[in-house]
Amino acid sequence: LLSTVMRETLFRGQAACRPLIAKRGLSDSFVDPALRFLEGRGTDFSLNNRLRGLNIEDGRVVGLDFGDRPAALDDGDTVVLAVPPLAAAGLVPGLEVPGEFRAIVNGHFRLERKIEGFSFLGLSGGLGQWLFVRGGVASVTVSAADDLAEEDNASIAGRLWADVALALGLGDVPLPSHRIVKEKRATFAQTPEQEKRRPGARTGLKNLFLAGDWTTTGLPAT
């Protein structure tokens, strides 16, 4: 995985190493435009309905079980299953998926003033790893944070804010309004054993395909 990342970035020169930052968040940059694109082409959306099962006949998916709202499929329909790995394993018979995961912890802090001309910074020597500033909010990320995720939010906030204040040159500023977000299954554990468990996009069912960073993309999940 590391060699692929290096070939796609460092070995291709500075133009391939320039990070892109979403100005107003990932929803504004990716999700909302995608929804508008699909809506403009007559796509129907059904949100907040958990997929409970796949109806399978003769090696293909013929229906989707949403509980009280089943959906039958036509002969030419294709299903793209973009759900977390454990959910996919519960839906697709015989599907092997990564079963070990790593946590990510994020801290978001309200700044007293906007920091002009600053977007993001890699941190070294502290707890935080990446620092992003958008508007009046500073966000700091810690990956592979399994142990940290078990700590209480107050302790995490204090430690991360110390990194933020130092990196931004804020001095001895009291802990501001903040939010700590823990995602205990943020990525699968990218070990050799778990890498072997990543499935491809194609499945044993003719019209069912998988999507997700936990599939065999050739790249890390983060």
Pin down the residues of each PLM region.
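FAD-binding beta-loop-beta segment adjacent to the flavin cofactor pocket
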Residues: 129-133, 183-210, 214-217
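Conserved beta-strand segments of alpha/beta enzyme cores
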Residues: 44, 174-177, 207
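Glycine-rich phosphate/pyrophosphate-binding beta-alpha loops
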Residues: 145-146, 214-222
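Short, intrinsically disordered, charge-balanced linker/junction segments flanking boundaries
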Residues: 42, 88-91, 219-222
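Active-site/ligand-binding neighborhood in enzyme catalytic cores
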Residues: 1-57, 75
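Short coil-to-beta-strand
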Residues: 2-7, 135-138, 203-209
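Mid-domain catalytic core of redox enzymes
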Residues: 49-181, 200-202
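A structural signal for the hydrophobic beta-strands that form the central parallel beta-sheet
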Residues: 45-47, 81, 210
